Curated annotation (Swiss-Prot):
Monomer. One of its GO terms (biological process) is AMP salvage. This is Adenylate kinase. The lineage of its organism: Bacteria, Pseudomonadati, Pseudomonadota, Alphaproteobacteria, Hyphomicrobiales. Gene3D superfamilies: P-loop containing nucleotide triphosphate hydrolases. Pfam families: ADK. It comes from Azorhizobium caulinodans (strain ATCC 43989 / DSM 5975 / JCM 20966 / LMG 6465 / NBRC 14845 / NCIMB 13405 / ORS 571). Keywords: ATP-binding, Cytoplasm, Kinase, Nucleotide biosynthesis, Nucleotide-binding, Transferase.
Length: 194
């Protein structure tokens, strides 16, 4: 099973990806997590990405595609994967199609979590408050100003990825504002027919 989860920041892509990993034994390939790990490790890619990520901007396609290509070659990705936070641009979607074709693979599903963007800031603030209450660090990208920058970048650059996949007949849409379990059930229904 190979799939892409689309939606703006705070839509629940990471939450649903984790549930899919637990239910289906596939790996979550979150560019955000991979980039944060590279930043924490101080790798050359991480150093390049750090300043861009902290300001809420998008990391270059070259860096992200390189990380994805390397990750797809790892043994645990052979059973299947979920791409969360990638592709973020039509150029990345096209590059992903080419990368998968070169590896003899294709996507089984592209699922967009449709959300009310006016309510996303509340969702992000709740996520930050929950992290604080648990004594966990708050993600830098959960800062309200950084979140607004990320949402603007999504609307400017990434929102066009859904129509890219829709034009190819690959896009399925789900109400991302529904309760978490309902969203999971809707995704499972799509995957049963994929």
């Amino acid at each position: 099973m190979r799939l892409v989860l689309l939606g703006p920041p705070g839509a629940g892509k990471g939450t649903q990806a984790l549930r899919l990993v637990q239910r289906h034994g596939i790996v979550q390939l979150s560019t955000g997590d991979m980039l944060r790990a590279a930043v924490a490790a101080g790798t050359p890619v991480g150093l390049k990405a750090k300043a861009v990520m902290e300001s809420g901007g998008l990391v270059s396609d070259e860096i992200v595609i390189g990380i994805i290509a390397e990750r797809l070659d790892q043994p645990d990705a052979r059973k299947g994967f979920i791409l969360d936070g990638f592709p973020r641009t039509v150029a990345q979607a096209d590059a992903l199609d080419k990368l998968l074709a070169d590896k003899g693979l294709k996507l089984d599903a592209v699922i967009e979590l449709k959300v009310d963007q006016a309510k996303l800031l509340d969702r992000i603030l709740n996520r930050a408050a929950e992290a604080k209450a648990k004594g966990e660090p708050v993600r830098k990208d959960d800062d309200p100003e950084v979140f607004k920058t990320r949402l603007e970048a999504y609307n400017r650059d990434t929102a066009v990825v859904a129509p890219y996949y829709s034009a190819r007949g690959q896009l399925q849409q789900i109400d991302g504002m529904a309760p978490i379990e309902k969203v999971t059930q809707a995704i499972d229904s799509i995957l049963e027919t994929a």
